[in-house]
Amino acid sequence: MTDKHNEEGKEKKLKLPSKMIIGKHVDSKKFKTSYFTSHNNSVTVEIKGGRKFSSSSSLPHKINTQISTIDEFNEKISLLKKAASFAKSEEYRSNVTNFSSTVEVTEQQTEAENSTNINLSEQTIKNNSHQSSSNTIETTQEKKQNDDLSSNITPVEAITQLEPNQKILQNQQNSSSISLNSIISKPQNKSSIENNVEFETEATSTKSSAIWTKKNNSAKPKKSDIYQMLDSDSKSKTRSFAAIKRARDKEKRKLQNNALTKKIYREVIIPDTITVNELALRMSEKLSDVMQALLKLGIKANINQSIDVDTAELIAISLGHSVKRTQDSDVENILHSDKDTQDSLLPRAPIITVMGHVDHGKTCLLDALRSTDVISTEAGGITQHIGAYKVNLPNNKSITFIDTPGHEAFSEIRTRGAKVTDIVVLVIAANDGIKPQTIEAINHAKAAKVPILVAINKIDAPDANPDKVKNALLAHNIVPEDLGGETLVVPISALKKINLDKLEEAILLLADMLELKANPNALASGTVIESQVDHKSGVIATILVQRGTLKIGDILIAGNGFGKVKRMINDKNQQVNYAYPSDPVKILGLSQIPNAGDAVAVVQNEKQARSIVDYRIRKAKEEQDLKVHNISLEELLKQASANQFKELSLILKTDVHGSLEAIVASINKIVNDEVKIKILHAAVGVINESDIILANASNATILGFNVKIDSTASIKAERNKTNIKYYSIIYDLIDYVKSAVSGMLSPIIHEEYTGRAEVRAVFNITKVGKIAGCYVTKGYIQRNSKVKLLRNNEVIFSGPLQTLKRFKEHTKEVKEGFECGIELANYYDINVGDIIEAFIVTEEKAKL
């Protein structure tokens, strides 16, 4: 048979050689070298590291292949095996001695299946791992023995992938040629690498056999052998798989880097306040770019500094991002999400706050109502803590009383008492009248829009004058009922329990008019009345339940702390499991001591509590950061001048938070131009070792109010001689601070004028200097006097005298009408006509 026209357009026949080699080297993990050898009229197909196939009668083949993957190469080997199997068939062997066959191979160059004849050549192997393969198979068979390979060999081009399911050989009976067709796809581009595998077999009529052997694959050929290509007249070297793979990886990285460098614009969620670092992370921008944008707005900030939402929005927009505002405070909405319906509201006990001036009988009144003796337990006989009590009345009704201190230092406590109350009972002593704290209580009640009920106490006193008190109330827009107004006024005596029943009736009447109701089935909420730290029980908070029912095990938020309610104790020191609206109770279980006046609320779970507390802490920090950032120039100058002041360092420890707050407020009112009071640490609890360490390091004084010192701290304080002061009455503590500040003040200097002298002559004395000859015109001049030298009514010197002489003798005093010699200390610019005034300096201890 003849092949189709080759590239020159001519017909060409190929002779069957005695030996056929399949390729030179195949670069894959599985196939290292593939070739055929002739053994005694048999053909052996040997694939190193793979398998061996032998046949006594086979068909000469030549395969040009471009291999992309190992699987595609395996398909080529499968094709060769099928060709060899056909060579063993009876039909082929019957005709093999009398004919020569040519297997024509076509190369598809276009999609319209145009073909050309391709001459057989020695194999050239090239491999491209990311492009499709092409194959051309051309076989020629002619019976001949021991012939060499034809030297007329040219490269084979554009061979495509073979499909394994198509027939490879077709048997044509009574014909002198056999055609092997392959499926050929489109030609590859110029960058494709051709892999040519030459397959030649020796055709004999002997019986065929298949031999499979395993070859040792341990020897790995060198790259120079594996990738060596054969050309018609010279050898050349191509790139290795590793090099191609590195090049492809480099290209991929380049594409990825280009994708990364392409800026992505985002929708940035910005809360009320945000740090510079967090803003940069949310925008995926460099910190340097964000800082530069801030500088353009005239803002100098570090990465941890907080900026407001408006500034953050300007930065985000300037960098090309869109902005979506959100509020972190949304987490607290769960505390107010449920609303009470009218049907869920039930009557509750009124909450009464007792207010008035100190020593007007507020606590004594509560003792009389509760039949207790609280006042005897108060230091100095005055109330220094806010207290809450529940009084059960004979008619199965109850009233909750809140007792507030009357001392001026406890203004904040009275303010809180007015805010949580329903009715203010203003206690005024009939023998003392309206005082400053009485007026303050009236103002607090009016500010809180709380009705006032006046109780004129001590009507049993000899000098009591209730009518005078009623008339004095008119000056503060409080008009009693008997004077035509709406304010209930009840004269009482707490000490002798006079008219206490009338006071209770007036309270209940006013409460009925207010229609006080609450929902007992809701989640509990209320207000912190007082808080403290106990060395055995931990944090204890006195709270007033204003809504819902508080139970043991509830998750409670109080200020910046939260916790599970472990125990509840009522005002009678009894442990209870439930607290209903208007009930005051002490609770244990909070993680952090709350401030008096903080709101408390029960939440569903610990996760909600933690998110709310984290928000509150973060908000407080951001507000502090903004406060520091927005400090004015005047404040900076004030701080700079404050550094020149003397400093009194204090550490304050109290039993409850209300007392701590009152003492700090009172100390801050002690202001002067020389001494600055610095409270290094103020907390609730006993004096501990860390307080001692801080006091020693800063030379501070520890002030303890109704607290003690623990044993470890006591030993350390005694060893280091730490200054610790203990007080149980707020008056004494404030007086000590004032005294300490006064002791640090510079004494007051007084100049007492004593006399005047006129300079009438100046004498230059060797080794002494200038001596002024003076005449005392007024008063007297003493040796220890301070003098001022005046010239043209201007002071040119002020200082002590060096010597005072009368003639040549030293003297202590020279009186008016006498002459004397005066030498000034280290000053010699004295002229005739100058005036010397003498005065005595006296010091007086400064007081606040």
From Swiss-Prot:
Keywords, comma-separated and alphabetical: Cytoplasm, GTP-binding, Initiation factor, Nucleotide-binding, Protein biosynthesis
Protein name, entry field: Translation initiation factor IF-2
Domain tr-type G: 347-517
GO cellular component labels: cytoplasm
InterPro entries assigned: EF-G-like_DII, IF2_II, IF2_N, P-loop_NTPase, Small_GTP-bd, T_Tr_GTP-bd_dom, TF_IF2_bacterial-like, TIF_IF2
Positions of region (Disordered): 106-150
Stretch list, region G3: 403-406
Residues binding GTP, per UniProt: 356-363, 403-407, 457-460
Region (G1) location: 356-363
Residues covered by region (G5): 493-495
Location (main, coarse): cytoplasm
HAMAP family listed in its UniProt record: IF_2_B (MF_00100_B)
Annotated Polar residues bias: 112-139
Superkingdom per UniProt: Bacteria
Organism encoding this protein: Orientia tsutsugamushi (strain Boryong)
Family statement: Belongs to the TRAFAC class translation factor GTPase superfamily. Classic translation factor GTPase family. IF-2 subfamily.
Region (G2): 381-385
Subcellular location: Cytoplasm
